[in-house]
Amino acid sequence: MAVSSALCIFSLLVLAQAQSELQQPKIELRLAGDKRKHYEGRLEVFYNNEWGTVCDDDFSIEAAHVACRQLGFLGAVAWSPSAKFGQGEGRIWLDNVHCTGRENSLAACPSNGFGVSDCRHSEDVGVICNQKRIPGHRFINIMNNNVETLEERVEEIRIRPISSHLKRIPITEGYVEVKERGKWRQICDEEWTPLNSRVACGMYGFPGEKNYNNKVYRSLSMRKKKNYWGFSVNCTGNEAHVSSCRLGKALEPKRNGTCGRGLPVVVSCVPGRAFAPSSSIGFRKAYRPEQPLVRLRGGANVGEGRVEVLKNGVWGTVCDDNWNLKAATVVCRELGFGSAKEALTGAKLGQGMGPVHMNEVECSGFEKSLTDCYFNNDALGCSHEEDAAVRCNVPAMGFQKRIRLSGGRNPFEGRVEVLAEKNGSLVWGTVCSENWGIIEAMVVCRQLGLGFASHAFQETWYWAGDANADNVVMSGVRCSGTEMSLPQCLHHGKHINCPKGGGRFAAGVSCSDTAPDLVLNAQLVEQTTYLEDRPMYALQCALEENCLSSTARKNDHSSYRRLLRFSSQIHNVGQSDFRPKLGYHAWTWHECHRHYHSMEVFTHYDLLSLNGTKVAEGHKASFCLEDTHCDEGISKRYHCANFGEQGITVGCWDTYRHDIDCQWIDVTDVKPGDYIFQVVINPNYDVAESDYTNNVMKCKCRYDGYRIWTYSCHIGGSRSSDMDEYSGMSNQLNHLR
């Protein structure tokens, strides 16, 4: 009886807490004020469509903890009374706030009530938060706008091409129409401006607009009945979408359907270079950024990624303080896309590396480049956990209509089936799986808009695809990884060659919203490199696992091998955990070292001549993938002890110390000279990652026959001079598959 009473009381308490959370007002918080860091400032509350402040009466460190956690930080370091960060304006929303520190929102703490205060703004409270942010916390800027926009009046907006342009891809020109109460209506162009056209083109993925042949549209409008929408549109030109523009004056269309002296609105957009058709080569085979100073990394789809800028020859990231759609749109247009769909914060698309070049970016939306915007050079306090990212509007190319996944358990997996021309008609068929790998699978998932590839399958007998699509219609597929669609990859064309045929051997994929991203700590490699002369009798296990040069097999046990040793620290800065490709059942047992290898080749270690030829090499099998250490606030998930689960958690790193077997390159046979020391992680693409360009690390080194000097170590793609060098490395790795 006592137990049931206790359970009843506990249930009532849980129910009361849930009801309390549902009843508490929804508020948003922000930090404001001058001369402050991004993690500190005057505490402001957004309530009842108005920003206001918090009085310092009875405020405490517990209340500061609640506020900082609500803002996405791990907690508070301190709080400050008496408007230390300047006096705010408007309402003082909260006074006499009493928190225990366990509340999920400042609104859950007892207070005088919203707007009930006897304070002045000279008593505005400020907080100083822990600089570390809660992993995965999404930051949303709340903006107040009392102006009625199109979003409140229309259901949809489109660009409708004239009949002679219907087959053009992409559609760059046509009538701008809005859907209201289920009917499409044209817009009168009397109040239409080039700024409106700029916004309309941007939302459809185009960076600019141009003039069009007015005579053609005037002639067409004279022959067709018009159905005008009853409002004009007023855009400033920096909106990300026409629906964000203000409604202009109401129009009074005449009975004959005209709008005074005007005509239906027409826009003609200029596509970015990657989407512009060419009579000689068709669409560009792969997306390449048009500007050298800004790039996107870590995104699954074309037009999205972490924003990186080039400064003094080194690529770095942008801190997300004040990051918004205007700044994101400048980036998107600069790279040949349209306006921004999203301005992402909190390293939503993975963490970068190297310096943080820009902070507190403020753009008007009309700048030609992000580097033209105002920004703070001082990124003190910013970390890669705050890397800004974008998702851009891109033109509709129709790629998704020509590919599908069939037979999978969910929409993210299945046999790959493509639409191909055969005997003058379009038919669905399969893709030959010979040499099919994760790079090709990445292109498929991108074409379908399903994110990253998690696996590539060369057998799909367990997925019952469309029986009418069993025939192979594409073979010899080899992708570089940057293509927007599978037909843009190299393939055999009409001359199909697939010895195994389709059916059970058709290519398949599984896709995922997220992917890991491994990056080596180049500085640690540079700091820990040294030479060791080690006797052969202590290297028998290493010899068995092919960690020594082939000449070592000719040596007796009393001879020595010269080893270039170093430590490696491999960070997962992606969006999901890095796991071995194979499960327990497929791991390989190595008797000499008495451990399993979850990946036979996890890293390649190479010493190269200055022209790129290998002069010595090594490799490291993943006998143990685990979370050696993690960032603050992240718990270890993978441990090798007792044959535990293997992997590297997001925000953690695995360390291979210099003093363990095979953590070296055998340089016994190397002559004195200048060389390139190279490490490649996941060289065979056994596990999917969001970015492979940063899997390569290179150092310069000089060997005099006795000593070795290692310097200038850096990750692939981290410097402007790496672009050609590392794209070449990517091609070399492709040939290994």
Curated annotation (Swiss-Prot):
Which PROSITE patterns does the UniProt record give?
LYSYL_OXIDASE, SRCR_1, SRCR_2
Show the coiled coil region(s). none
Could you say which cofactors this protein requires?
Answer: Cu cation; lysine tyrosylquinone residue
Q: Recite the UniProt keywords alphabetically.
A: Basement membrane, Calcium, Chromatin regulator, Chromosome, Copper, Disulfide bond, Endoplasmic reticulum, Extracellular matrix, Glycoprotein, LTQ, Metal-binding, Nucleus, Oxidoreductase, Repeat, Repressor, Secreted, Signal, TPQ, Transcription, Transcription regulation
User: 2',4',5'-topaquinone is carried by which residues?
Assistant: 656
What Enzyme Commission number(s) does the record list for this chain?
A: 1.4.3.13
Q: How is the cofactor bound?
A: Contains 1 lysine tyrosylquinone.
List, for all copies, the residue spans of the domain called SRCR: 29-130, 159-270, 294-393, 403-512
Q: Which cysteines are joined by disulfide bonds?
A: 55-119, 68-129, 99-109, 188-259, 201-269, 235-245, 319-382, 332-392, 363-373, 432-498, 445-511, 479-489, 541-592, 547-662, 624-640, 630-652, 699-713
Q: Name one Pfam family in it.
A: Lysyl_oxidase
Q: Which residues form the signal peptide?
A: 1-18
> So where does Ca(2+) get bound?
517-518, 689, 691, 694-695
The GO terms this record gives for MF are: calcium ion binding; copper ion binding; protein-lysine 6-oxidase activity
Q: Name the enzyme's class.
A: oxidoreductase
Which residues are modified by glycosylation?
A: 256, 423, 611
Reactions catalysed, as given in the entry: L-lysyl-[protein] + O2 + H2O = (S)-2-amino-6-oxohexanoyl-[protein] + H2O2 + NH4(+)
Q: Which GO terms describe its biological process?
A: collagen fibril organization; endothelial cell migration; endothelial cell proliferation; epithelial to mesenchymal transition; heterochromatin organization; negative regulation of DNA-templated transcription; negative regulation of stem cell population maintenance; negative regulation of transcription by RNA polymerase II
Question: What function does the entry list?
Answer: Mediates the post-translational oxidative deamination of lysine residues on target proteins leading to the formation of deaminated lysine (allysine). Acts as a transcription corepressor and specifically mediates deamination of trimethylated 'Lys-4' of histone H3 (H3K4me3), a specific tag for epigenetic transcriptional activation. Shows no activity against histone H3 when it is trimethylated on 'Lys-9' (H3K9me3) or 'Lys-27' (H3K27me3) or when 'Lys-4' is monomethylated (H3K4me1) or dimethylated (H3K4me2).
Cross-referenced PANTHER family: LYSYL OXIDASE HOMOLOG 2, LYSYL OXIDASE-LIKE-RELATED
Designated name of the protein: Lysyl oxidase homolog 2A
Tell me the lineage of the source organism. Answer: Eukaryota, Metazoa, Chordata, Craniata, Vertebrata
By which gene is this protein encoded?
loxl2a
